[in-house]
Amino acid sequence: MANSAQARKRARQAVAQNAHNSSLRSRLRTAVKAVRKAIDAGDKAAAAEIFKNSQATIDSIADKKIVHKNKAARHKSRLSAAIKAMAA
């Protein structure tokens, strides 16, 4: 248990930061799922448009260090490859 005023404040801040970071991680997963859903539907134009919008979200979350930049790059790379494979 936090005994000093500073420790109590840091504990409160940690709870708030955890909630905020969790919501951002959820936004990342939602963005990836939206692109995957469009790919599964077979609509390349829609998938490309959703992917274009999702890239900003993915990069933004990586810039805030909620997820590692390499994980964000891996998501974008795999989604891009899946969209390109739709034409083949």
UniProtKB/Swiss-Prot annotation:
Pfam families listed in its UniProt record: Ribosomal_S20p
GO biological process, one term: translation
Coiled coil: none
GO molecular function, one term: small ribosomal subunit rRNA binding
Keyword set, alphabetical order: Ribonucleoprotein, Ribosomal protein, RNA-binding, rRNA-binding
Function: Binds directly to 16S ribosomal RNA.
Family: Belongs to the bacterial ribosomal protein bS20 family.
Record's protein name: Small ribosomal subunit protein bS20
Species in which this protein is naturally found: Cupriavidus pinatubonensis (strain JMP 134 / LMG 1197)
